[in-house]
Amino acid sequence: MAMAASSAVAASCFTLASNAICSSNLGTSPGLVLRKSVFYCANAELKCRGRKASQFTRRVGSCSTARASAADVKTSEVAVGQATMDEIVPAVIVGAGRVGTALEKMGGGKDFVVRRGETIPADKPGPIIVCTRNDVLSSIIDSTPSNRREDLVFVQNGMLDPLLESKGLTATQVLVYFAVAKLGDPPTDGITDLNPEGLTAASGKWASAIAARLKSAGLSCKVLDPEEFKKPQLEKLIWICAFMLVGARHPGSTVGDVESKHRDELASLVEELAAAAESEKNIKFDSGVVDRLCAYARSVSHFPTAVKEFEWRNGFFYNISQRALADGLSDPCPTHTAWLKEVGAIKS
């Protein structure tokens, strides 16, 4: 009976290692699976203690095979990472702050960094990754050589579509769900318990190049077509608008406080903004929006809250309200409007 149990454990060990190899081939990090493999191997060896040598050898042999397979996977994973690094497309990076510096470090010294006051070169090919504040985006676009504007890549929070449309651009956009704590620190991926595969996404001409760059640093990034991009783009906008506004109603609140202490307020606001976004952009969110946004909040629970960059964030929904009222219709976002007035973001 004990021998059968030990055999089953050893077999599980080998199966897990094999699955890890399959995960690696699919582009999924096998780290968690490998750790489980080693755990099961240890258990198999413990269960084998006290058995005859031949029995023990057989059990440990299976575990040794699994460990060898796990080692092969680890080696393969390193090789895949190196191959990705070799294939990274050199870029022009505008801005040398936390995000810009982190992205430049992923480029292996092949990127060209444009700092404040410098001009974007016309003769450098590849993506132009803009890592600046939103309020200078218009001037950056205008100062970019006209033949290079289609190569612009934007990583900012907020709704950029109106600006890009006004400039006649269909540029690459990235929904950044990784965080850089301070200048020079490596980025931390914003994976959640509901989305362990990661949430960062890119769409546009250089989306695949951006994904390769991020994945070389161990970060996730989905490549989406423009239609697929709309829903996660708006979900992230709703996240930052709702969490920041509810937090502003409760001074000193962190994102985690909003999620854990004021969830009812948050849920009502998220549902209101989601309905407005669906109507405005002719989309339908997948069920569970509130749960997904709260899951992300838990991964960045220490972030402070404040209503800022109004034009790019809450301004998107406030403009929807203003247009409706101008047409003699009711405000589709009455709670949002009332709370903006309450915190002083707009005039009463």
What is the predicted function of each stretch?
Residues 100-107, 117-192:
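Rossmann-like NAD(P)(H) cofactor-binding subdomain of soluble oxidoreductases
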Residues 56-126, 131-141:
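Hydrophobic, well-ordered beta-alpha structural blocks that scaffold small-molecule cofactor pockets
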Residues 52, 56-67, 72-90, 264-348:
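NAD(P)-dependent Rossmann-like dehydrogenase/reductase catalytic/cofactor-binding core
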Residues 208, 213, 229-274:
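Active-site-proximal catalytic alpha-helix in oxidoreductases
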Residues 154-238, 242:
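Rossmann-fold dinucleotide-binding core
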Residues 1-55:
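N-terminal chloroplast transit peptides
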